[in-house]
Amino acid sequence: MRLCRVWLSVCLCAVVLGQCQRETAEKNDYYRVPHYWDACSRALPDQTRYKYVEQLVDLTLNYHYDASHGLDNFDVLKRINVTEVSLLISDFRRQNRRGGTNKRTTFNAAGSLAPHARSLEFSVRLFAN
């Protein structure tokens, strides 16, 4: 009987948490459940991951080259696909948990999406074995 009560309590807490997150999401168009991409994304195939990394590196290098020559070319940064970056970060985290990447590999991402501004900051440090 006690085990049944504990099980019902855990289920009830999960339902209440899900309902609260749903209500919050309905009030705010920009709300995302914490770890949204971790929970909802599949592992990326190697070819897709390499393509995303290559595009991201090319775009950021173009921007930094322009910035070093006195040009602020924000059109280059606008071409960065935030979804691809989120999927890459999720994939790196998933691999790191499984032990698939070097333990010294680090990554960090932070972003905000609001009606008046969008921001995405990320860093990935990869080390050879």
UniProtKB/Swiss-Prot annotation:
Its main location: virion. It is found in: Virion membrane. Coiled coil: none annotated. One of its GO terms (cellular component) is virion membrane. One of its GO terms (biological process) is symbiont entry into host cell. Residues 1-18 form the signal peptide. Keywords: Host-virus interaction, Membrane, Signal, Viral attachment to host cell, Viral attachment to host entry receptor, Viral envelope protein, Virion, Virus entry into host cell. Plays a role in viral entry into host cells. Forms a pentameric complex at the surface of the viral envelope together with gH, gL, UL130 and UL131. This complex is required for entry in epithelial, endothelial and myeloid host cells. Mechanistically, engages host receptor(s) including neurophilin 2/NRP2 to mediate infection. Contributes to the formation of the complex between UL128, UL130 and gH-gL. Forms the envelope pentamer complex (PC) composed of gH, gL, UL128, UL130, and UL131A. The pentamer interacts with host NRP2. The interaction with gH is important for the formation of UL128, UL130, gH-gL complex. This is Protein UL131A.
